[in-house]
């Protein structure tokens, strides 16, 4: 039968002590340094939702390398914590505060034309900060914020070559974007090469990359 949990139930000392020991162990693990930042890493909310940042560059570079993709995209809204991580040690807590959602990496294949639409979506709210703004790796693009949304992207290059609307590109994404989240319906309709159940965790991938760079 169901037992209601109310304030009338006395605290069990043995359970309390067990939970406290576990909490202390977890706190020590979270505060364990896993690497070092040679420069401050910018995870401030306004910045990651309106412009390229070095934290966004690092995360998307790791995503692209991990899945061997042509490029990687991460919505700025996936980065939380709203802070500038100072130069110095990076802990597990730091990385989990920046990426708290438990996202899994997905590899999809999309045409260049769909990527163009995605980039238009990314800058549609600019200069207003928006969670849909994309941090990117493997591509560069310019846009004109004075033009109407949907017509702002001027040119795009993927690994130094102009974006080909007809070509298929492989893209590393968090599962949220792969499901069409934040208005990215073109990814929800994309061909999936590595689905979420088989993809690596985003924060685990980042932890591994930071630890490898330390060694």
Question: Where are the regions that the model predicts?
Answer:
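Catalytic centers of hydrolytic enzymes
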Residues: 1-215
């Amino acid at each position: 039968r169901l037992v209601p949990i109310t304030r009338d139930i006395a605290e069990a000392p043995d359970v309390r002590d067990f939970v406290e020991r576990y909490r202390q162990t977890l706190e020590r693990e979270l505060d364990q340094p896993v690497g070092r930042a040679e420069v401050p890493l910018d995870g401030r909310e306004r910045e990651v939702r309106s412009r390229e940042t070095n934290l966004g560059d690092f995360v998307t570079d790791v995503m692209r390398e991990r899945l061997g993709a042509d490029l990687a995209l991460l919505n700025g809204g996936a980065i939380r914590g709203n802070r500038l991580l100072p130069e110095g040690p990076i802990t597990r807590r730091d990385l989990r505060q920046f990426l708290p959602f438990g996202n899994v990496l997905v590899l999809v294949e999309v045409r260049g034309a769909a990527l163009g639409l995605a980039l238009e979506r990314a800058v549609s709210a600019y200069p207003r900060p928006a969670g849909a703004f994309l941090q990117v790796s493997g591509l560069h693009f310019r846009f004109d914020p004075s033009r109407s949304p949907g017509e702002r992207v001027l040119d795009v290059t993927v690994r130094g070559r102009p974006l080909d609307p007809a070509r298929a590109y492989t893209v590393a994404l968090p599962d949220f974007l792969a499901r069409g989240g934040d208005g990215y319906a073109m990814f929800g309709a994309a061909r999936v090469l590595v689905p979420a159940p088989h993809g690596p965790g985003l924060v685990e991938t980042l932890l591994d990359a930071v630890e490898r760079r330390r060694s």
